[in-house]
Amino acid sequence: MLGLGPQQAAFEAALGALPDRLLDTPVGVAVSGGSDSLALLILAHRWAARRGRVLRALTVDHGLRPESRAEAEAVGRLCADMGIEHDILRLEGAAPRQSALRRGRHAALARTIADKSGHLLLTGHTADDQAETFLMRARQGSGWYGLAGMRPLSLSPVWPEGEGVFIARPLLGIRREALRAFLRDEGLGWADDPSNDNPAFERVRMRRLLCPEMSRNVPVLSLVDRFQTLRMIEDGAIWRWMTANVRAGEAGIHVASFAGHPPERAARALGMLLQIAAGREMPPRGESLRRLAEEIVSKGDFRGATLGGCRITARRTHICLKPECGPLPPGTAARLAATQAILSGNPNEIAASAGKESFLEDLVPIF
């Protein structure tokens, strides 16, 4: 972009792909005080000043280090100098497990954004984080879909706190060292969290593997780009199928047909729907999901099953997914619409899909 530095131009290009619906309300910026999030804050501030947008900086303090309070307050002073509203979200007493800390952090951020009538949270994930995620997932045996890494735009990973909140990662195309060089040029320092160098954490071990020599010989980010292209194609196919065959009604999520899906795609789509119907944060995975999808697609005598907290029943013209106990969770239709929007590759589908709760009367029979 004319007149902008490379980091600012990359940041603004990433946000330019988002719909106004997400940007017209206060935009949350997650800022820990580390280099990545601090660069994110500066870039977002300059973008917002030019575009007339409103930012809300959010710092989560888990209270696990003596320095954390001072670091959060330092972010607050910087925000005050820039005229940005800043909230410190204190989560003292949280369980020290990484998974629990992550969930608590995302829940607090999502609640605060929703309280400010916002829909979008910006995070400082970089190209380095993407490469580390690739190695972590490869080590865990993830398939190609998972190896595509983090999405530029996704739904909040927590539920129900994250209902209506999206996460954008506008720095995924920028290396960490480039952001640190940007901060040095601005005369800004940053806080270093010792846990980022603790080999007890898997991400730190993967980071150490990504030495310059490996990056030259194993183009991890090039592999991620290729898998992302494949994922876009796969997501588009699932989105088109969902648009034609899936509706949320009062009795459950209704699916007209899985016909024509390759087995792997059918399992992936079914997992997404089971996650939504059960109101869970993760979909079921593995052999049980694959077998269930195969049974639904290939067997004309399918009568029902349970998986992932859901009961799957066969009706005359469709199958129905609903929680094993009780009604569908509140917000199910909106969550289904938002999931479809992410899959479409066009976030404007969020507005077009919102509120679709009716059940198609002309669903095509599956059996």
Swiss-Prot record:
Enzyme class: ligase
Domain of life: Bacteria
Pfam families: ATP_bind_3
Gene Ontology MF, one: ATP binding
Catalytic activity: cytidine(34) in tRNA(Ile2) + L-lysine + ATP = lysidine(34) in tRNA(Ile2) + AMP + diphosphate + H(+)
The EC number(s) this enzyme carries: 6.3.4.19
Keyword field: ATP-binding, Cytoplasm, Ligase, Nucleotide-binding, tRNA processing
Binding site residues for ATP: S32, G33, G34, S35, D36, S37
First-listed, main subcellular location of the protein, grouped into a coarse class: cytoplasm
GO cellular component terms, semicolon-separated: cytoplasm
Cytoplasm recorded as keyword: yes
GO biological process assignments: tRNA modification
Subcellular location(s) of the protein: Cytoplasm
Domain notes: The N-terminal region contains the highly conserved SGGXDS motif, predicted to be a P-loop motif involved in ATP binding.
Functional description taken from the UniProt entry: Ligates lysine onto the cytidine present at position 34 of the AUA codon-specific tRNA(Ile) that contains the anticodon CAU, in an ATP-dependent manner. Cytidine is converted to lysidine, thus changing the amino acid specificity of the tRNA from methionine to isoleucine.
Family: Belongs to the tRNA(Ile)-lysidine synthase family.
Protein name: tRNA(Ile)-lysidine synthase
Lineage per the UniProt record: Bacteria, Pseudomonadati, Pseudomonadota, Alphaproteobacteria, Hyphomonadales
The gene coding this protein: tilS
